[in-house]
Amino acid sequence: MATSASSHLSKAIKHMYMKLPQGEKVQAMYIWIDGTGEHLRCKTRTLDHEPKSLEDLPEWNFDGSSTFQAEGSNSDMYLRPAAMFRDPFRKDPNKLVLCEVFKYNRQSADTNLRHTCRRIMDMVSNQHPWFGMEQEYTLLGTDGHPFGWPSNCFPGPQGPYYCGVGADKAYGRDIVEAHYRACLYAGVKIGGTNAEVMPAQWEFQVGPCEGIEMGDHLWIARFILHRVCEDFGVIVSFDPKPIPGNWNGAGCHTNFSTKNMREDGGLKHIEEAIEKLSKRHQYHIRAYDPKGGLDNARRLTGFHETSSIHEFSAGVANRGASIRIPRNVGHEKKGYFEDRGPSANCDPYAVTEALVRTCLLNETGDEPFEYKN
């Protein structure tokens, strides 16, 4: 089980320098989604004072030819601050800054899905769409082997690991706890965490978040997890099926509701939304992973608590369905529903936008509707 060389560097020595005063200066780490649509990049700049709002953060640029976002002959891309969080690594007053990416001509970059998602969310703000996303992930050594697994064989079969306790059942809990606390410090709306069905697989939940906030908070939570794993010398994988065979995949189940769904009699509105989703299954499958459904095809097999990628289904408390209505929602006749389609490496902006387009804007067909400004 290989760990990175950086994890063997003395953290005590680093801590000695991190305690040095920084005067009035502030370090702002700018974070963005690269051309893959699923990986993150970051770089840091010095500010003269602590920013209190996005307006205090300057626009910046980067070399898009090194992030799969531009050609070398015209490589400058723009970073426009979109959301700001406390920095749990450098501590206050330093900041994490999630950015949107724009091309040389100020047009939105191809993987800047936040840009259109924000417009769609603004159109339905009076319906107060809430989201909660359940991010599953797998811990790996730098050699790609699952963290804690025997080097030349497999661990025992699935069964004792989900919410498991003990060194033989929970692999990597220190990472999970560090990530949880770092998210709380940063201001991420992290809701909880648990060990998952496959050993070395974990989940954290973010939400409820309203509108565009869902994507902002999940992307920053992912960034923080990558950085925590970097410190521990391991890798976090959001691959939806990291280990072939009789092992669970990794999803990002998405809980969705509107004000009407959360009020008395809301089950009627939930059922109406599910009916709309049933008629637009393939559109959602394409939106639910960065490769247009190819990644999810390895996960949505109809086995290991998944539905078939080829068929739409829904049911109360059914984890083998495309859409699950929680049992308490069925009992209380109001609440939310869970879309079990999104893959672990999905873009939350794409997922939440697709749900709003279909369920609230009543779009149909295989392509998103183009709205005029």
From Swiss-Prot:
Q: Which residues form a coiled coil?
A: none
- Show where the GS beta-grasp domain sits: 24-106
**GO CC terms of this entry:** cytoplasm; mitochondrion
Found, by tissue, as follows:
Expressed in retina, brain and liver. Little or no detectable expression in breast muscle, pancreas and spleen.
Q: What is any one GO biological process for this UniProt entry?
A: glutamine biosynthetic process
Q: Which domain of life is it from?
A: Eukaryota
UniProt binding sites for Mn(2+) 2: 136, 196, 203
What is the name attached to this protein's record? Glutamine synthetase
